[in-house]
Amino acid sequence: MKILKFGGTSLSNSELFFHVATIIENNLNNEQIAIVLSAPGNTTNLLEIAINQTINNKNIIPIVQKIEKNFLKLINDIYQVEQKLLYEKIKNNIENKLLELKNLLQGINLLRQCPDKIRAKIISSGEYLSISIMNSILISRGYNTTIIDPVKKLLTKEDTYLNATVNIKISKFRILSMKIPKHHIILMPGFTAGNKQGELVTLGRNGSDYSATILSVCLNSTMCEIWTDVNGVYTCDPKLVSDAKLLTSLSYREAIELSYLGAKILHPNTIYPIQKFKIPCTIKNTHNPSSIGTKISCNHVKNKNLITGVTYLENVHMFSISCLYSKNIETIIPKIFSCMSLSKIWIILTIQTSSQNTISFCILKTMTNTALHVLHKALYLELKHKLLKPIKVEKKLTLISVISSDILNNTKITEKVFSILKHVNINTLAISKGASKNSISIVVKHDDGILGVRALHKGIFNKNCTAEIFLIGIGRVGQTFLKQIIEQKNWLKSKNIDLKICGIANSKNFILNLDGINPKNWKRDLNLSKKSFNFKHLLNSIQNYYLINPIIVDCTSDKNIANQYISFINCGFHIVTPNKKANTTNWKYYEDIRLAAQKEKKKFFYETNVGAGLPVIENLKNLLRTGDTLIHFKGILSGSLSFIFGKLEDNISLSEATKQAQSLGFTEPNPKDDLSGIDVARKLLILAREVGYKLELKDIKIEPLLPKEFNNISNTTDFITKLKELDQIFCNRVKKARKLGKRLRFVGIINQKGNCQVKIDEVDHNDPLYNIKNGENALAFYSKYYQPIPLVLRGYGAGNNVTASGIFSDVLRILL
């Protein structure tokens, strides 16, 4: 025997009714099937609206007409396909139900209230019509059926009409006494049962699910399947957390805990019957029948992560009741729980407090007024004689819970939870982990709820080394960086590294997608974007997201962006950049960036500031960390000038060599910036500061390559034309050096006293810079450890590929 229950989203239209009928047929494999159905679509909600509008003397005709229209359309659409359908019989059932509904609503209108007995009759109407329609479909397909009337067969324990529980023993006897033939498909409306007087009552929240598990026990079934609109139970609400993972297996205890603490799955009352009788239950997706679903049983596969899921309850209020004397609290607590229980107010959990004379507990917002009333009544004398402080209620809270199989015995989980919340600056108002060994619950402000849930889920379940990259500047280097990430996709995946491009900005446009920008469409999306990069806008966009390793990658040469680095760091971002402006501005800002990074425990990597892809900065730092000291430095620090001066050796003119360097991408858009020597001076300043010299850019002496009259030329074409005037001068200098067995090189020098100079130098064949050309950089460090032969770093110091690879390397250094 197998029980199949289908919810309202599985029965919203004729296509879904046929689809459900097919699922039923596919399950008729050597075992009997029993079906429990909810009302179609949003029928129950419409019925609730009709009741409330009637009480408030509002026009209900449109609501009733909508309900009637929905059902008539449903059976008409079914009849168009299933000609054998008992159409007139179903139509009469619908008309009779609607007539009964109208009469009941008329009575409510006269009373100006709705007794629970009447409410139960009205809100359960849809389930009976679902059964009538499905029964007719199955009969038209040649199947024999038996319908169980839950009002006659399921006996409830209490006299309540709206939230009843079922007496399983008597109900089971009644149903088994029906002696239903084995070849019959059994159908039963969900959500309802009968009291001792034989009156219809409802089973509360998730009532149809409860009906299914009760029927499973009553029919001695081997499996209960709950068919809904999701693939099963997830590690978190997939509507809130896009990468929530499907849980294929749960224990009964875990399922109860998840449900109790906010997961939108089965209600705890639904699980208790199958837990007691050890009946497995699988949650399946009507729209995706092939999905494995989530199986709840006593033989579940244990979660390797130890943690089952993260749940949340919104609209929670926290009550705090304090005694003046700690000895009185022991007499107060039973009174509190007794009056709350009698009033059927659900205490979600009690809270640990540091004070021994205070008890705190959480309830749902909807019960707050009732709770205050019953508490003031129960504790009247204590409050009157001021043995208690006034009852304190803290509102607008969210309860976040982490469910684990054995959380109390695993302190690492608790430590991780608080570490993650601290990382995103969420203040914990209260903690509870004593009520159950399977969960820890944290009370936070409502505004922190979504961020807290996302942060905990990502921090707990993300097993990859993840970085969220916000790329500013999408010129040649920026585009090459993106290309390299795409090309290394398989390697990154093999190392469990997830680099998500979450933002891309140029001088005009900005796109943002915290789930990751599609690398194939970024150009189109950026061009279509009407937003420009604004750091405040970025912060507003990410405030409800937990970013594991957010990295600003600044591929601009923009001073304004560089001036925001401290703000980036203080807001939780690492920084990777080839932009030299931040490291070559005034010494105070240079120092403040490093202090901010140290304080916030963030990385500020700028390896590409000096040698593009060459590992210059980190190697220099390693030397100094191990006690080495710099005696002398000499290097070719410009790929463009390396190329140009190399071409001069090949008897190519200065102007022609500069044009070639520009066409190959070695120079800035205007080559004047390269030939001014300022770029080399900036790199030299960065190296000098790394060594410990507190210098400013003005302290670097630059031997200008160009006469002063070149400074006013902004047009690139005009500049190249004007440059021809210097061709002969440089040709003569090359010849002069050649006669001496030397070559011209444009170098940066740091001497032992920290004096820095940028100049054209004549180097002989013993100099490590002698053979450097074609865009190569070479840096010779003479130190206490490396002399008389220096440590030389040599390689291409310009070009899109090597610069982008240096940026890529810095990003990976943050993760690895």
UniProtKB/Swiss-Prot annotation:
Cofactors required: a metal cation
Homoserine dehydrogenase as annotated region, ranges: 472-816
Catalytic activity: L-homoserine + NADP(+) = L-aspartate 4-semialdehyde + NADPH + H(+); L-homoserine + NAD(+) = L-aspartate 4-semialdehyde + NADH + H(+); L-aspartate + ATP = 4-phospho-L-aspartate + ADP
Region (Aspartokinase): 1-250
Residue positions binding NADPH: 477, 556-557, 580, 799
Cofactor note: A sodium ion is seen in the structure; a metal ion may subtly affect the relative position of the nucleotide-binding region to influence enzyme activity, and could increase the stability of the enzyme.
GO biological process: homoserine biosynthetic process; lysine biosynthetic process via diaminopimelate; methionine biosynthetic process; threonine biosynthetic process
Region described as Interface: 251-471
Active site: 683 (proton donor)
Residue numbers binding Na(+): 607, 610, 612, 614
Enzyme Commission number, as recorded: 2.7.2.4, 1.1.1.3
Ranges annotated as spanning the membrane: none
Sequence positions that bind NAD(+): 477, 505, 556, 799
An example molecular function term from Gene Ontology annotations: ATP binding
Binding site for L-homoserine: 668, 679
CDD domains linked: AAK_AK-HSDH, ACT_AK-like_2, ACT_AKi-HSDH-ThrA-like_1
Pathway stated in the Swiss-Prot or TrEMBL entry: Amino-acid biosynthesis; L-lysine biosynthesis via DAP pathway; (S)-tetrahydrodipicolinate from L-aspartate: step 1/4; Amino-acid biosynthesis; L-methionine biosynthesis via de novo pathway; L-homoserine from L-aspartate: step 1/3; Amino-acid biosynthesis; L-methionine biosynthesis via de novo pathway; L-homoserine from L-aspartate: step 3/3; Amino-acid biosynthesis; L-threonine biosynthesis; L-threonine from L-aspartate: step 1/5
Binding site for NADP(+): 477, 508, 556, 580, 665, 668, 799
Keywords: Amino-acid biosynthesis, ATP-binding, Kinase, Lysine biosynthesis, Metal-binding, Methionine biosynthesis, Multifunctional enzyme, NAD, NADP, Nucleotide-binding, Oxidoreductase, Sodium, Threonine biosynthesis, Transferase
Subunit relationships: Homotetramer.
Family statement drawn from the similarity comment of this UniProt entry: In the N-terminal section; belongs to the aspartokinase family. In the C-terminal section; belongs to the homoserine dehydrogenase family.
Functional summary from the UniProt entry: Bifunctional aspartate kinase and homoserine dehydrogenase that catalyzes the first and the third steps toward the synthesis of lysine, methionine and threonine from aspartate.
Protein name: Bifunctional aspartokinase/homoserine dehydrogenase
Protein's organism: Buchnera aphidicola subsp. Baizongia pistaciae (strain Bp)
